[in-house]
Amino acid sequence: MHLTLEFGGGLELLLEKSTKVHKVDLQPNDGDGKVVMKGLLAWVKSNLIKERPEMFLKGDSVRPGVLVLINDCDWELCGGLDAELEEKDVVVFISTLHGG
């Protein structure tokens, strides 16, 4: 499944080369051919995050203060960790936490 992942608000600094936009190809982990957000977050942790994963994740989810959008819609409205992703979806992660 081809997805576009975008990172902003400083989250891109946790990734290799600090790249904001990533075009990725994920294979479903289960037998029904679906990719859900929980699986995507585990994949991001294993494949994209190169330092301080605790700044992005808390347990199996994103940490408080990280806004997640699936095709410009708040992921909580789409099902949160159980939200099913579809081919060519765009998932955006934005940190709303910053110093002052």
From Swiss-Prot:
There is a cross-link at G100 (Glycyl lysine isopeptide (Gly-Lys) (interchain with K-? in acceptor proteins)). One of its GO terms (cellular component) is nucleus. Transmembrane segments: none annotated. It is found in: Cytoplasm. GO terms for molecular function: protein tag activity. C-terminal thiocarboxylation occurs in 2 steps, it is first acyl-adenylated (-COAMP) via the hesA/moeB/thiF part of the MOCS3 homolog, then thiocarboxylated (-COSH) via the rhodanese domain of the MOCS3 homolog. The keyword Metal-binding does not apply. Pathway: tRNA modification; 5-methoxycarbonylmethyl-2-thiouridine-tRNA biosynthesis. GO terms for biological process: protein urmylation; tRNA thio-modification; tRNA wobble uridine modification. SUPFAM superfamilies: MoaD/ThiS. The modification 1-thioglycine is found at G100. Pfam families: Urm1. Keywords: Cytoplasm, Isopeptide bond, tRNA processing, Ubl conjugation pathway. The keyword Transmembrane does not apply. InterPro entries: Beta-grasp_dom_sf, Mopterin_synth/thiamin_S_b, Urm1. Belongs to the URM1 family. Acts as a sulfur carrier required for 2-thiolation of mcm(5)S(2)U at tRNA wobble positions of cytosolic tRNA(Lys), tRNA(Glu) and tRNA(Gln). Serves as sulfur donor in tRNA 2-thiolation reaction by being thiocarboxylated (-COSH) at its C-terminus by MOCS3. The sulfur is then transferred to tRNA to form 2-thiolation of mcm(5)S(2)U. Also acts as a ubiquitin-like protein (UBL) that is covalently conjugated via an isopeptide bond to lysine residues of target proteins. PANTHER family: RURM1 PROTEIN. This is Ubiquitin-related modifier 1 homolog. It comes from Oryza sativa subsp. japonica (Rice). The gene is URM1.
